Amino acid sequence: MTDEFVKLLDQGCADLGIELSDQQKEQFFKYYEMLIEKNKVMNLMAITELSDVITKHFVDSLLLVLAAPELGLKLDGSAEYSCIDVGTGAGFPGIPLKIAFPGLKVTLLDSLNKRVGFLNEVIEALGLTDITAVHGRAEDYGRDAKYREQYDICVSRAVANMSTLSEYCIPFVKKGG
């Protein structure tokens, strides 16, 4: 793990009021390394510069923390929440949220099986628990009783326009979620 990586990550997280442990920083760094390596053979992300990955992928994925008080969410570990990341792609925002908030139960949903395979590699390499990568389409899984109305939180990035995204996400959120 480089000093530059730690400095940039600490700075971005501090702006959000998040303090990461050394283990969490190591997990973010390993995730970064895996993203860069896999991106050589699979188009996971266009942004690959260290500072941009930290700012535009990792820290941006954690912006939920700013809305948490408004939504009545306590992400300090004092309450358990389930979260589905629809169209997760390379794991954003689901994996950064899981690293920063280990008590979160996360489902990563993506329509491409090869990305789901990569996400499973990341989950194993980082030693993450209570996180599952699922291959499927939101419009199908939103009708499946196993997933429909099962989550407190639904997150997504760069999937569709807001009206379409709402149609994808709302079926996953339980009443009061």
Each model region followed by its residue ranges:
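Residue-level preference for alpha-helix termini and adjacent loops
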Residues: 19, 43-46, 52-53, 58, ...
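Conserved SAM/SAH cofactor-binding pocket of Class I
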Residues: 62-160, 164-167
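A short glycine-rich, Lys/Arg-flanked "PGG" loop and its adjoining helix->strand segment in the class I
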Residues: 164-176
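Solvent-exposed, non-transmembrane amphipathic alpha-helical segments
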Residues: 29, 55, 59, 117, ...
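A short helix->loop->beta-strand "cap" motif at the edges of active sites that frequently abuts
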Residues: 104, 176-177
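Class I SAM-dependent transferase core
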Residues: 1-78, 84, 121-131
